[in-house]
């Protein structure tokens, strides 16, 4: 990464400018938040291939909620997050209770989410706009000029570190990732943790 930055700075004097770096960090923030959830799933020894359409479904349902008026605008973010959590719970149930390989069940959930969104939109681009809160998080910035999206990424990252290193849930995630059966025999509620992890990733 350092080498890329150095080479880029040779071609453009503004490549390493604070404004450009903050812009790139704002773009990276969205992927960073998504990657945080995916990382916890990987620590379980599983994989989540439903990310593309779970993210798309959450965003599309959030913007759809905005079209419901003031109440819908206030509930837009909870609706989007709830949609992701619901799809994550489906994936988690398939892995934890039905014992379907995570690669298979999450790929299926991804396809189902895609189909549901096509039915919801009729195959056309959604026409509803984002809510003020969504625009504030996505494009706003603090008084210091730091993008709000970057602040959210930092908060999510700190919360993930705390969850994984300072809680029983985090220790159980690592234990399941090392050997699920051993974690189960030691008394850990492995199924609940697996479902919760996929819900968090959603």
Locate the predicted segments by residue:
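Single transmembrane alpha-helix segments in multi-pass membrane proteins
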Residues: 5-73, 93-100
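Transmembrane helix-bundle core of multi-pass membrane transporters
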Residues: 102-166, 193-196
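Structural signal for alpha-helical transmembrane segments and their membrane-water exit/capping regions
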Residues: 2-16, 44, 118-125, 162-168
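Helix-loop-helix "hairpin" substructures at the membrane interface of multi-pass membrane proteins
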Residues: 71-80, 86-91, 95, 143-202
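Alpha-helical transmembrane segments in multi-pass membrane proteins
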Residues: 4, 30-38, 54, 58, ...
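Juxtamembrane helix-boundary/capping and inter-helix hinge elements in multi-pass membrane proteins
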Residues: 46, 99-103, 129, 178-180, ...
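Hydrophobic alpha-helical elements at and bordering transmembrane segments
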Residues: 21, 25, 29, 112, ...
């Amino acid at each position: 990464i350092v080498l890329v930055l150095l080479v880029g700075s040779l071609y453009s004097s503004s490549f390493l400018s604070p404004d450009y770096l903050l812009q790139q960090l704002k773009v990276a923030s969205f992927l960073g938040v998504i990657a945080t959830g995916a990382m916890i799933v990987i620590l379980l020894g599983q994989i989540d291939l439903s990310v593309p359409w779970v993210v798309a479904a959450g965003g599309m349902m959030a913007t759809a909620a905005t079209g419901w008026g003031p109440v819908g605008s206030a509930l837009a973010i909870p609706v989007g997050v709830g949609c992701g959590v619901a799809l994550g719970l489906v994936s988690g149930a398939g892995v934890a209770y039905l014992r379907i390989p995570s690669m298979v069940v999450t790929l299926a959930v991804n396809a189902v989410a895609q189909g549901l969104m096509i039915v919801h939109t009729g195959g056309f681009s959604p026409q509803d706009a984002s809510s003020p809160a969504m625009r504030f998080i996505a494009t706003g910035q603090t008084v210091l000029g730091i993008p709000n999206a970057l602040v959210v990424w930092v908060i999510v990252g700190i919360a993930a570190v705390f969850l994984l290193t300072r809680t029983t849930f985090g220790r159980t995630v690592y234990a399941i990732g090392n050997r699920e059966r051993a974690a189960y025999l030691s008394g850990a509620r492995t199924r609940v943790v697996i479902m919760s992890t996929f819900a968090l990733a959603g």
